[in-house]
Amino acid sequence: MSVADIKKGVEQKMQRSIEAFKNDLAKIRTGRAHTGLLDHVQVDYYGSMVPISQVANLTLVDARTIGVQPWEKNMVAKVEKAIREADLGLNPATAGDLIRVPMPALTEERRRELTKVVKGEGETAKVAVRNLRRDANEQLKKLVKDKEISEDDERRAGDDVQKLTDKHVAEIDKLVQSKEAEIMTV
């Protein structure tokens, strides 16, 4: 394995960590409605559990309401039940074959709790990125030990890995700040 392979691999893994972090952030409910909030809701579709997006059309009715339109009329009750039981604190209301999911306004206390959750998720993501840096540095040390690269090359590559780490940690910080601002906006 070459130095370039190590750097390329660690950058890809760090990018995947950022993507996973973004997905985690998308699941955290803010006062504003977005269809991504229901992405992980599973619906019982003729005996098998499937994502809600495979049995219904999700749209934004307004800034605080998600519209869920099941493709089959007989699925309306099951979809509503799945949303209610998804532990998101949502209370869907059915009007014909359209399910409206209003976003309740967040209390100040709940907003503060959510910002703590966001910070915690951010720290977890940073730890993942730093662990990737550690793994890359260990691989570089192994190359030096096996006399495949010089110590100078290892130091340069280590600096490059540190720059990648700093870049990704800064991106995580930026995502945390924007999510906190979104949560605290009334």
Curated annotation (Swiss-Prot):
A GO term for molecular function: ribosomal large subunit binding
This protein's GO CC annotations: cytosol
InterPro entries: Ribosome_recyc_fac, Ribosome_recyc_fac_dom, RRF_sf
Keywords: Cytoplasm, Protein biosynthesis
A Pfam short name: RRF
One GO BP annotation of this record: cytoplasmic translational termination
UniProt xrefs under Gene3D superfamilies: 3.30.1360.40, Ribosome-recycling factor
Localization per Swiss-Prot or TrEMBL: Cytoplasm
Protein name: Ribosome-recycling factor
Organism annotation: Burkholderia thailandensis (strain ATCC 700388 / DSM 13276 / CCUG 48851 / CIP 106301 / E264)
Lineage of origin: Bacteria, Pseudomonadati, Pseudomonadota, Betaproteobacteria, Burkholderiales
Gene designation: frr
